[in-house]
Amino acid sequence: MSRLARFFFAPSVLLLLAPAAGALQVGAVVPDFGMPTLEGRPFSLAQAEKTHAAVVILFISTICPYSNYYNDLIRDLSAEFAKKRVVFVGVNSGTHETAEEARVHAREHGHAFDIIKDPESRIAGLLDAGRTPEAFLLDGSGTLRYHGRIASKLSSPDLRTAIEALLEGRPIRPAETKAFGCAIPRR
């Protein structure tokens, strides 16, 4: 490799490996956002935080096989933890899926939680979400406590473990895992 190629290659690799400048880190307060749900109800993150012990923001998709693999687990987790004042909100980003497709998909899979259609991927940009499925767990004060995958092949219940630790006042370990799945389209 020539000296010139090495000069440009090494910094490029470091940039790819470094966290994005705007990426929220675990421990940061997530800025408030509000948008209507698929059912037309207003959703406000700040309001959800005030009335719940925790908020789970899930980036989900109707067409991503990775996201669809976890539909039953997502449904079960949201129902189980609703009893413990944990609210789930789904975010369907991009224009490749319509609000009606997302609404039908939610009904078919028993997703009883609110889902926001975010065609311009503003929420994904705010949280620096890159994949479906991808989870963000916030405590009641809006602080990011866990970010990453829902589970690893259903055998490593990362999100469940994080929610349980948060509710019990224990440290969340790991507080960050690598989300895998389909890329969230950005404009």
Annotate each PLM feature.
Residues F8-P19:
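Bacterial N-terminal signal peptides
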Residues N68-H109, I116-L126:
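Structural microenvironment flanking redox-active thiols in thiol-disulfide oxidoreductases
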Residues S61-D72, T95-H96, A135, C182-P185:
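Short, thiol/selenol-centered motifs that function as redox-active sites or metal-ligating centers
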